[in-house]
């Protein structure tokens, strides 16, 4: 068992004030991507290469569940996010659409530890021959499923509401279309599933247990990552806006923000490669209640944002370069301890 003890000492303004944390590796995995608690002792997780597993966080036993997903592991794609809700499983994945083309698709099934027989409830169209920018995070609010569909590296497709890539999707839990989506409220040229456009590669999506808003994180290009709110019928501006970043060639993309587009709550330039997020609520770190926790891949850090006052957002680095690239984050529903998918492992964070 690998245990790292961390003393975060208040040296710089952006480093979290002195705390003793314990980071413990629970189990080793192979390219884990998404996770969801199914009860107080078990997580269901995905591995991008195609496996769905149950991990008992007490006994540390791992079991694999057979499934029928027609997925393709291609570049950044594979089996991605997973969400347990009311004894159903929702999964976002890279669907093989033939001729080298794939889509961000969502499937649903009744939960079983023996076999998961998924049925599709959404496909992002058109399918695209690309291994980039699938997005793929899932969140449920009331009886609606929200999902992020990345722009697949196609840039300005995110400004085309007749195509799904580069948008936030909102559908009913059975895959049908809500009658109050933007399409039916003045956005007659929008596809009926689309809730918001102008997004690049959103790998964080969460419902706040406090204000009941949906929040997201998004990858910029060379700089320009951000954290913001999902807003009905609005446009975050990609690829008209660059959010402070540039193309990988160094050529500017566009302004950081301008009127007419949704403004993010917080930006990162240079990029930290934001991934999964949560709005913390729990006992273990009760002083963090209501704060956003942002995982990062490139920067290998956990960031904490205090954003109650949008004119004075405060950021702390909780830890950095301790457990590898942080892909996903879950808060235990009872005790508030924090679990990460990072590198090729599941990790636990708790107070000493």
Regions found by a protein language model. Give the residues of each.
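Residue-level detector of conserved, well-ordered beta-strand and adjacent loop positions
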Residues: 24-27, 66-67, 122-123, 184, ...
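Sec-dependent N-terminal signal peptides
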Residues: 3-13
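Acidic, Gly/Ser/Thr-rich repeat motifs that build Ca2+-stabilized beta-propeller blades
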Residues: 17-155, 204-219, 270-308, 332-351
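Short linear, low-complexity motifs centered on an aromatic residue
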Residues: 1-2, 82
């Amino acid at each position: 068992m690998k245990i790292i003890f961390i003393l975060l000492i208040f040296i710089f303004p952006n480093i979290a004030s002195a705390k003793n944390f314990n980071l413990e590796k629970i189990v080793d995995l192979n390219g884990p991507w998404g996770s969801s608690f199914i009860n107080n002792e078990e997580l269901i997780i995905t591995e991008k290469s195609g496996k769905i597993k149950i991990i008992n966080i007490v006994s540390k036993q791992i079991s694999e569940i057979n499934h029928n997903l027609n997925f393709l592991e291609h570049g950044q794609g594979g089996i991605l996010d997973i969400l347990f809700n009311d004894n159903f499983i929702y999964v976002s994945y890279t669907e093989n659409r033939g001729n080298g083309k794939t889509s961000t698709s969502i499937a649903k099934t009744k939960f079983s530890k023996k076999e998961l027989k998924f049925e599709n409830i959404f496909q992002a169209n058109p399918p695209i021959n690309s291994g980039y920018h699938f997005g793929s995070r899932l969140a449920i609010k009331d009886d609606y499923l929200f999902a992020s569909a990345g722009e697949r590296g196609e840039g300005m497709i995110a400004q085309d509401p007749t195509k799904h890539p580069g948008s936030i999707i909102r559908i009913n839990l059975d895959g049908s279309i809500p009658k109050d989506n933007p399409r039916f409220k003045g956005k007659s040229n929008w596809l009926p599933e689309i809730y918001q456009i102008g997004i690049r590669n959103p790998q964080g999506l969460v419902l706040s247990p406090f204000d009941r808003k949906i929040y997201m994180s998004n990858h910029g290009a060379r700089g320009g990552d951000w954290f913001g709110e999902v807003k009905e019928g609005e446009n975050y501006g990609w690829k008209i806006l660059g959010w402070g970043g540039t193309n990988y060639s160094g050529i500017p993309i566009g302004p950081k923000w301008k009127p007419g587009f949704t403004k993010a709550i917080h930006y990162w330039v240079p990029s930290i490669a934001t991934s999964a997020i949560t709005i913390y609520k729990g006992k273990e770190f009760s002083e963090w209640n209501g704060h956003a926790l942002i995982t990062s891949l490139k920067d290998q850090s956990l960031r904490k944002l205090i954003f109650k006052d949008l004119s004075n957002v405060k950021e702390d680095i909780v830890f950095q370069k301790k457990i590898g690239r942080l892909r996903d984050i879950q808060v235990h529903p009872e005790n508030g301890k924090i679990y990460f998918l990072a590198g090729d492992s599941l990790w636990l964070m708790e107070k000493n």
